[in-house]
Amino acid sequence: MASTEGANNMPKQVEVRMHDSHLGSEEPKHRHLGLRLCDKLGKNLLLTLTVFGVILGAVCGGLLRLASPIHPDVVMLIAFPGDILMRMLKMLILPLIISSLITGLSGLDAKASGRLGTRAMVYYMSTTIIAAVLGVILVLAIHPGNPKLKKQLGPGKKNDEVSSLDAFLDLIRNLFPENLVQACFQQIQTVTKKVLVAPPPDEEANATSAVVSLLNETVTEVPEETKMVIKKGLEFKDGMNVLGLIGFFIAFGIAMGKMGDQAKLMVDFFNILNEIVMKLVIMIMWYSPLGIACLICGKIIAIKDLEVVARQLGMYMVTVIIGLIIHGGIFLPLIYFVVTRKNPFSFFAGIFQAWITALGTASSAGTLPVTFRCLEENLGIDKRVTRFVLPVGATINMDGTALYEAVAAIFIAQMNGVVLDGGQIVTVSLTATLASVGAASIPSAGLVTMLLILTAVGLPTEDISLLVAVDWLLDRMRTSVNVVGDSFGAGIVYHLSKSELDTIDSQHRVHEDIEMTKTQSIYDDMKNHRESNSNQCVYAAHNSVIVDECKVTLAANGKSADCSVEEEPWKREK
């Protein structure tokens, strides 16, 4: 009877299961395309809001330009939320660089750190040279410069000449800061000053004539032979010395990694600090859509004569933009695919949030917290790689800047009717590469390093001011390419170093297992020792006395050796 009931119930159970599975499989097919799109956008809500903020800022800025002249205070208020965003991002740069470098390098041995650094530097220098050469080829092929533009744009502002030797020495000086606290907000720079120097007098004035001249209030006129002499000196300029901080904390992290368990407390501290900073990054990123929209809108409104500038420097802008698109959209993904054999476009989708943020903020260092989050959470790249490669890359890997500087230098030469020979073109390429390495990761740093290139090939430095009108757009685009280059570099270095990182992880696991075994063994020994001590008695009676029943009395100090045995009162001999 039971078997008959089981046989009758079996088809019902099977029928119900088939019915449930049928409903589950057919439901997604009938879902509307709009609902699926909304679900997709909901999962990437922050990215969607950021893209919407960029579009909204550009549209609102263009519409407000059509209105009557806007008061500067109104423009300032429109851009104010964007200014707050930049301040918050820059606020996190210092703790993020410190914590990321130390935590990343402390988990690696010296050999692994050296290999990671070597691979990163080879990638950085290779892509920067490729970008500079691409810029030279495009500007020579398109030839955007025309001597007639010089008459339309007018004369530029005179700039102080910069020596390549001084710039190189300043780079080395900043790499070794004399005061670590001062390096957080200042960096050293060689400054040239023009000083009036009078020739030495023919006759030395004695003390009497000097006193008489003072009593008579005689005014000595400056002799006509006075000469203008240029003197050099070192001065501290405002701005974080990122290069010096990176150099120090790289050494600090490697030294702490060599200490092993002795530095575990410090490693835990910086790990917690890094996690706290990343939590703050997530909070700030939900504010970024509004800040980026206000930044772009305010910048577009503040531009004067946008149409005239676009007409005069349109071909120059097109040359730079084409070069950035080719380098960031073709060359970098191609290098990533050749090395890793992985889809570069899915990788780019993972860093799209960082790319949009760089486009809005125009700062590689300001985008650094977002880049960390994209690579570690979206793409699953090892934190030891990102925390070492990204801070260094944000400082010295400037592919977009190298391309921009090469194009701008040759454009200025074409605008002045100067024909550069092969040697000068090579000089422009090499100088653009080296100057981009020394450029600080701050907005419009390319205009500062441009002085080095123009001085190296003997071009007028005052023409740099003519390019400032369009730098607001090109700065954002080259910064976004810089961030993309840093991200692809982290992915390539992680792919090449994955086996070594796995080996280090396995060694750490073996070490942890050994430590756990030792700890368990010590714990078991202590437990057995306590159990044996609790059962141990030290008999004070004579060997010939046999005690049938006894009571163990522990001494006040709790030691087993102080135990005594005494008979119960009713068992004692009378």
UniProtKB/Swiss-Prot annotation:
Binding site for L-aspartate: A362, S363, S364, T401, I442, P443, S444, A445, G446, D475, N482
InterPro entries xref list: DAACS, Na-dicarboxylate_symporter, Na-dicarboxylate_symporter_CS, Na:dicarbo_symporter_sf
Any one cellular-component term (Gene Ontology): neuron projection terminus
Catalysis: reaction(s): K(+)(in) + L-glutamate(out) + 3 Na(+)(out) + H(+)(out) = K(+)(out) + L-glutamate(in) + 3 Na(+)(in) + H(+)(in); K(+)(in) + L-aspartate(out) + 3 Na(+)(out) + H(+)(out) = K(+)(out) + L-aspartate(in) + 3 Na(+)(in) + H(+)(in); D-aspartate(out) + K(+)(in) + 3 Na(+)(out) + H(+)(out) = D-aspartate(in) + K(+)(out) + 3 Na(+)(in) + H(+)(in)
Notes on the domains: Contains eight transmembrane regions plus two helical hairpins that dip into the membrane. These helical hairpin structures play an important role in the transport process. The first enters the membrane from the cytoplasmic side, the second one from the extracellular side. During the transport cycle, the regions involved in amino acid transport, and especially the helical hairpins, move vertically by about 15-18 Angstroms, alternating between exposure to the aqueous phase and reinsertion in the lipid bilayer. In contrast, the regions involved in trimerization do not move.
Name under which the protein is recorded: Excitatory amino acid transporter 2
Membrane topology per record: Multi-pass membrane protein
Annotated Na(+) 2 binding sites: T395
Transmembrane stretches, start-end: 45-64, 88-108, 121-142, 236-259, 269-296, 318-339, 385-411, 472-493
Subcellular locations according to the entry: Cell membrane
Associated disorder: Developmental and epileptic encephalopathy 41: A form of epileptic encephalopathy, a heterogeneous group of severe early-onset epilepsies characterized by refractory seizures, neurodevelopmental impairment, and poor prognosis. Development is normal prior to seizure onset, after which cognitive and motor delays become apparent. DEE41 inheritance is autosomal dominant.
